[in-house]
Amino acid sequence: MAQATSGAARFSAVPDAPRSDDAALVAALRADLAAAGFTVDRVTDLVGPEAMSAWSRDQAVPARRALRERGSQDPALSALTAFFLLGDPVRSSALDAALHTVGASGLVRLGLVEESTEGTSTGTATGAGTDPLLSAAMDLRPYATDSSEELWVASDLGAFQRPGVLRHDHVLGIGGASTTLVQSTPRRPVATALDLGTGCGIQTFHLLAHAEHVTATDISERALATTRFNLVLNAPALGLDPERLEDRVRLELGSMLEPVAGQHFDMVVSNPPFVITPRTPQESDTERFTYRDGGLPGDRIVRELLSALPSVLAPGGTAHLLANWEIPHDPQDAPEATWSRGPASWIPEGTGAWLIQRELQDPCEYAETWLQDASQQRDPEGFDRAYAAYLDDFASRDVAAIGFGMVWLQRPEDTERTAESRHGALTTDDAAGSPSAPRGASRDADDAAGAPNAAHGASQPGMSAPSGPEGERTASGTVEPGRAASSSLPRIFETVPHPIQQPIAPALAAEWERTVRLGREAADAQSGAAGQPAWLERRFTVAPDVTEERHGTPGAEDPSLILLRQGAGLRRTVILSSEAAGFAGVCDGELSAQQILTALGVLLGWEEGPSEQLVAEIAGLIAHGFLLEVSD
């Protein structure tokens, strides 16, 4: 698709997308939105928190009711809310009054409105003639986090704002999946970052807060045009010069890793088009929902991406993404026990990996989720055909379940690259990509490129015995043993279905750092470079969010079960041995771990010191953050 305006900046004038070729007009829109008070907090005050919560679930009735009752208190804000957030047609005069400088005509030039086909207005104005009804061509919503300035983010309208099946080149907005990725991405300072499958640009906005330069890619010109518009609209808040965006942001058109082949990044973030979709011989690109469907059969898009991502990571670089994976039927084990076999085999040797499965769906649940996501139920006959095709597709590969979760990859800092020699960059012809705790105006349907709420149906943390840095299979997952070299990175696969702290990124980063350190110390001790793990000489205290729970038979002298529960982070619950419980009970930061174990040995009559099992159990408590190191 060619740019609409000759000489315009790349992606600034793409048909059927918001335009950013007139920076002054976009700046005027920004000023008008701010003057109208079109912010998360002001909109919530106007319609009420319950209506905003319903709106996040794609339910507009409560907000419309609130606008009818209270909209006259703030006509400008009411008009913008009805127009951009609810998708209701509004009179041109009402938009002129709400946006004093830009007005309705400016919105038309920016590609944000179209003439309405409805005959009556549910908004704030009446009348006809020279005051036509206009409808939003794009969703434009306020967005903020606890640590950022207010932003406004454009994307395509959702199904509840514009009834009917979504367009196949739909530009995804802010939803549950994109928010999950925002909250699970660590915000360490980096020189270069890659937003793979940028969609509306939400991940790029957050990356700009801690990355010197961001490359954002997508297979969709409309998505890149929308991202560019959002960057120009929010340039001051993002620290950008709208006339020199390329100084900090580069937009690249192409499939998956093709646009960045041969380049290396300190951080990669992606909500890739991982949704499994039945393939048909006669399908064309125009029939595919490119924002969520990479065009490959089964979970191959995830398989190839996990294999190829290390090839674009700089030494020490990390990748953070959401993904799903098929779990084949196993007559001996349930999917909960076998899900990691596939992902573990896809990741190149030497690459550190942490996969957290958050949800498991059977084929029927999965089909229903994604058919409804694109509003395909609005075509009953087509829905039934597509549903049957999903079940046939899964049956052809003997799929028992589909897992969804978070992925963390890291390239070692001090080893030669192995991924590039074993895996080329991902270059599928048909692959596509659209992907701090955010507040307010974001749909919580896990939207189009995301997945169902990973915490759905879970209320209590699962229980497991803690695993040490060298790893063992537990009820919560698998930690593969580290290689002999002290530079090896861990490979962790675990299931965490219960609600977790948000944003979770700080806790994940801290746990990963502890696990890497403990693994290297264990490898040094095993190789003879050190007599014993170095952590034994350090002092620890119980984390402030940790509580102990004891269960016992009435009248019994000793408990039959001792639990430690976390109130923060991944909110793990672990079963402790009596020895480990005794160790944790003495950790007040005064004595080293070795001193405590020596005292326990005297008390319990050990002849040869603590068992390897106890040492691994304590190391697991340290890695998972139940015990925190005390600094000198």
Residue ranges and their predicted role:
Residues 3-79, 132-136, 141, 161, ...:
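Acidic, low-complexity/disordered tracts enriched in E/D and polar residues
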Residues 75-123, 127-136, 180-186, 194, ...:
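Long, charge-rich, low-complexity alpha-helical segments
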Residues 114-118, 129-193, 198-210:
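SAM-dependent Rossmann-like transferase core, predominantly class I methyltransferases
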Residues 166-177, 187-188, 219-388, 401:
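S-adenosylmethionine
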Residues 213-218:
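Conserved SAM-binding motif I beta-strand of class I
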Residues 401-407, 624:
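Short hydrophobic/aromatic beta-strand or adjacent loop that forms the aromatic wall/cage
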Residues 405-415:
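Core SAM-dependent methyltransferase catalytic element
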